[in-house]
From Swiss-Prot:
Residues 10-24 have a biased composition (Basic residues). Residues 1-24 are annotated as: Disordered. The keyword Ribonucleoprotein applies. The gene is rpmH. It comes from the Bacteria. This is Large ribosomal subunit protein bL34. GO terms for biological process: translation.
Length: 45
């Protein structure tokens, strides 16, 4: 059986796909908008 190799780093995840990072760019804001429209509980990480 293979091991799960993905550890996941909270800081890196926030820096790449956090809310404030999304709000910086036009396309990021579009992501937030579409997720709001869809009714997502979590808009960003």
């Amino acid at each position: 059986m293979t091991k799960r190799t993905f550890g996941g780093t909270s800081r890196k995840r926030k820096r790449v796909s956090g809310f404030r990072v999304r709000m910086r760019t036009h396309t990021g804001r579009r992501v937030i908008r579409s997720r709001r429209k869809r009714g997502r509980t979590r808009l960003a990480v």
